[in-house]
Amino acid sequence: MEYPRSEVVINRMATTEITSQNHDQSVADGIVLLDFWADWCGPCHMFAPVFEGASEKHSDITFGKVDTEAEQDLAASYGVQSIPTLVAYRDGIPLFSQAGALPAEAVEDLIGQLRALDMTEIRAEYEKQKAAAEGR
């Protein structure tokens, strides 16, 4: 007797390579986490499985990786001086930036905080700060 083959499909959300060409579109909507890294960076390699694990667990979030060697101008625009650096957006608004390899629990806590935010208040404050910076 032959049994039907069953295949298990795992819903994996791969990380996205972020470049200066796709950056603005990538951070525009929803929750986005950006990992600034370099291949020569030991702590970056230690953080990579944490970041990848979170991307597999939270398929509704965009997880982007910015290679600081290939995207030096993009890294400079964020003022990245130490890697890895994790940057978080929600609805196109940058809300968090921290250098260092975070443990999985800290990444999960950050995601929970990002999900819980009242974006109406934050959007209003962000627009106010942008207007002040532009001298309006």
Give the label of every model feature segment.
Residues I31-L33, M46-V66, Q72:
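Conserved helix-turn-beta segment immediately C-terminal to the redox Cys motif
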Residues M119-R136:
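CheY-like receiver
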Residues A28-D39:
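Short active-site neighborhood of thiol/selenol oxidoreductases, capturing the structured segment around
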Residues V87-E121:
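Non-catalytic, surface beta->alpha helical segment in thiol-disulfide oxidoreductase systems
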Residues C41-C44:
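Short cysteine clusters
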Residues S6-Q25, D60-T62:
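N-terminal "domain-start" segment that seeds a small globular fold
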Residues V32, Q72, Y78-V87:
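Structural micro-motif
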